[in-house]
Amino acid sequence: MTNYHVSIGEFVTEAGARIPNVEVAYHTWGTFRGDNAVLVEHALTGDQHADEWWPGLIGPGLAIDTRQYFVICTNVLGGCKGTTGPSSPHPDDGEAYGSRFPAISIRDQVEVEYQFLKAIGVEHLFAVMG
């Protein structure tokens, strides 16, 4: 398992709010070969630690075999485990966004994941699950 963060730059929500310097926290398992990426989505209160909340499913020889697949799991926009969200520092004062964090939609979360996948060089997903 590998822990990473990647910046996707500024993100504009579908409501028009601007969030500068969005960082996405994620984990990967396996080796990327261009056509073997599997994106695992977490529950509303989940995080990028899919191997912890799906124990026994991700790994060599398991249902999501990391000898065959490159498995990616992100923490969603607005999440509390490393991706930009209410606990992140606000660019104006360095204090946590808190209630100043803009309202986000599922479309916003999906778009951030799409921008994230482009940023790490994944152009095609073999599967999306969660």
Task: Give short role names for the model-derived ranges.
Residues H27-H90:
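N-terminal cap/lid subdomain of alpha/beta-hydrolase-fold enzymes
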Residues E23, E41, E113-L117:
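Short, well-ordered alpha-helical packing segments
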Residues P20, I104-R107:
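Conserved phosphate-coordination/catalytic loops
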Residues V128-G130:
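Short beta-strand immediately N-terminal to the catalytic nucleophile in serine-hydrolase-like folds
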Residues T13-A15, I58-L62, Q115-F116:
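Catalytic micro-motifs at enzyme active sites that drive phosphoryl/nucleotidyl and oxygen chemistry
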Residues M1-A37:
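Catalytic-loop region of hydrolases
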